[in-house]
């Protein structure tokens, strides 16, 4: 049986934040957890499905692979690996522990959370995308508090062991015949208490701040490309590792060129006389103007390829081409002398359309035959 889409499993959109994914996971994991549905095989299968979706969509690398390749990109049988099925004990700790501020790993203490990943949408001109550049980005984020060095405790003091749970992060509560472990209500699962909190971060260990980063954009990027800056996301809780920053690239439409992969396309207007007699015209490229030789009797719509005048691939040394489509432009605002010359020219073609305009002659012959067949 084919797997369901992970976003569908959790009931979130593809643009859902990590927080939204986690919220959906908690709700569904609690609903389908085997301890709440003893003997229910369907609930157990749904629980495993929710667990797997959550593990993929909260891991930035696995999520990127899934978004690009679907289930094939995260299939453990395609690379040797995998979690080997859902661990009910771990998930019980993840879900119910997080609700109270802690889990059961690490001897019962809630592990300080890694910083959240950030996304920055960067819009570039075609010239910037093709040639590459360095960009200064101003990112609003959470950074480690400097006065307390991220500990949350005022300088000169430090967190103390919680007296309620004795540093375990959990306490045992009795409900009828059952003893239930839950996060310590005093320290919220950390196992430590900040008695003298830092004045700047108020015991949080992190503060809001905008930071400026210089990001090198490689030549050849295109809309949809993503640049990962490891460790430049939000600071983690109480010294935990920071998240990553993902720069999402989009390229504005250009007035002259259209891009398709590494090739560029443009339309170049030419005069009637230039198309008939041939000659040279100037063609724009991203490196400046170049001359293009137009053969005699060139028809409108003809495509000319200028090799190596396209875009350098961001993933190799290959360079695309510039494809120029010539479009014959009908002259306008003619004076009487110019019109008279065209009439004289037209008269010289009378009776010679097959010689000078073979396509038109063939077209009208076809129209004539069509009506003859229609009336026969």
Curated annotation (Swiss-Prot):
HAMAP family tied to this protein: DnaJ
**Which stretches of the protein fold into CR-type zinc fingers, per the record?**
132-210
This chain is encoded by the gene named dnaJ
Cofactor binding note of this UniProt entry: Binds 2 Zn(2+) ions per monomer.
Please state what the protein is called. Answer: Chaperone protein DnaJ
- CXXCXGXG motif repeats sit at 145-152, 162-169, 184-191, 198-205
Superkingdom of the organism of origin: Bacteria
Which species expresses this protein natively? Shewanella piezotolerans (strain WP3 / JCM 13877)
Q: What is known of its domains?
A: The J domain is necessary and sufficient to stimulate DnaK ATPase activity. Zinc center 1 plays an important role in the autonomous, DnaK-independent chaperone activity of DnaJ. Zinc center 2 is essential for interaction with DnaK and for DnaJ activity.
């Amino acid at each position: 049986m084919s797997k369901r889409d992970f976003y569908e499993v959790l009931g979130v959109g593809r643009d859902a934040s990590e927080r939204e994914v986690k919220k959906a996971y908690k709700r569904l994991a609690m609903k389908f957890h085997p301890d709440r549905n003893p003997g229910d095989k369907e609930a157990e299968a749904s629980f495993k499905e929710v667990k797997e979706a959550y593990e993929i969509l909260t891991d930035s690398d696995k999520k990127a692979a899934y978004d690009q390749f679907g289930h094939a990109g995260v299939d453990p049988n395609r690379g040797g690996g995998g979690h080997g099925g859902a661990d009910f004990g771990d998930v019980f700790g993840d879900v119910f522990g997080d609700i109270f501020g802690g889990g059961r790993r690490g001897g019962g203490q809630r592990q300080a959370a890694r910083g959240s990943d950030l996304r920055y949408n960067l819009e570039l001109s075609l010239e910037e995308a093709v040639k590459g550049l360095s960009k200064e980005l101003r990112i609003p984020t959470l950074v480690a508090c400097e006065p307390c060095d991220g500990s949350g405790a005022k300088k000169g003091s430090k967190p103390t062991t919680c007296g309620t749970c004795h540093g375990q992060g959990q306490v045992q509560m009795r409900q009828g015949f059952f003893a239930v472990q839950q996060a310590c209500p005093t320290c919220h699962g950390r196992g430590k208490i900040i008695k003298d909190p830092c004045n700047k971060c108020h015991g949080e260990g992190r503060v809001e701040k905008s930071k400026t980063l210089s990001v090198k954009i490689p030549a050849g990027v295109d809309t949809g490309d993503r640049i990962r800056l490891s460790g430049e996301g939000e600071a983690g809780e109480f010294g935990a590792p920071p998240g990553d920053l993902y720069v999402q690239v989009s390229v504005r439409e250009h007035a002259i060129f259209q891009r398709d992969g590494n090739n560029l396309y443009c339309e170049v207007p030419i005069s009637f006389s230039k198309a008939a007699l041939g000659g040279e015209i100037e063609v724009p490229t991203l490196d400046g103007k170049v001359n293009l030789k137009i053969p005699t009797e060139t028809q409108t719509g003809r495509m000319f390829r200028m090799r190596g005048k396209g875009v350098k691939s961001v993933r190799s040394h290959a360079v695309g081409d510039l494809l120029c489509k010539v479009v014959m432009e009908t002259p306008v605002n003619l004076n009487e002398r110019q019109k008279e010359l065209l009439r004289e020219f037209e008269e010289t073609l009378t009776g010679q359309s097959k010689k000078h305009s073979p396509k038109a002659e063939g077209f009208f012959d076809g129209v004539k035959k069509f009506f003859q067949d229609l009336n026969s």
